[in-house]
Amino acid sequence: MKLTSDVVKKISSIKGEPKWMLDFRLKSLEAFNKSSNPNFGPKLDIDYDSINYYKEREEKLTDNWNNISCGVRNLFDDLGVISAEKNYLDGIGAQYDSEVIYHNMNKELKEKNIIFLDTDTALREHPELFKKYFNTLVKYNENKFTALNGAVWSGGTFIYIPPNTHLDRPLQSYFRINSKNMGQFERTIIIVDEDSELHYMEGCTAPT
């Protein structure tokens, strides 16, 4: 799939994003087209036109594993995600290709005003907080890869921990790529306020 402004606009339209986010995506696309592959790390020969940049969700976002199709649910079960949530975690998000399909946290955390959401929901429900911290630590124009992520990002996790708040157990996000030539471009945004503490984990897999 050739990465064009039409692809970027389609992603933003499907997600129902505000204009400032579409503008950010298009600005990132321009930076991507103008930059070369970074010279750090190994030499990478990437065919950008062979990447599938976005796949529309087949599963609706839910906080109940029983609402997810058996095949996908069994996959996450085999990966240990479901049992980890039951036994070790205060909350978990699970992404399948381009979109988060499962997200949940213990009700005790909600009572502490902790925010733990997928990025689309966070942008919709907490727009000012999201915009304040989005693109502040890693800038879209740092290199070609950050620009690419800025243009086509989808999914990921948004966490806000209020002041003087400590979590007893970790939060986790799990990212699964399951489609051929699929690119996964999630964003992780974590804000831990003054005198607070969080243990956060990520996991990711793809077919061998």
Predicted feature locations:
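Glycine-rich and polybasic anion-binding loops at the starts of cofactor/ligand-binding domains
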Residues: M1-T208
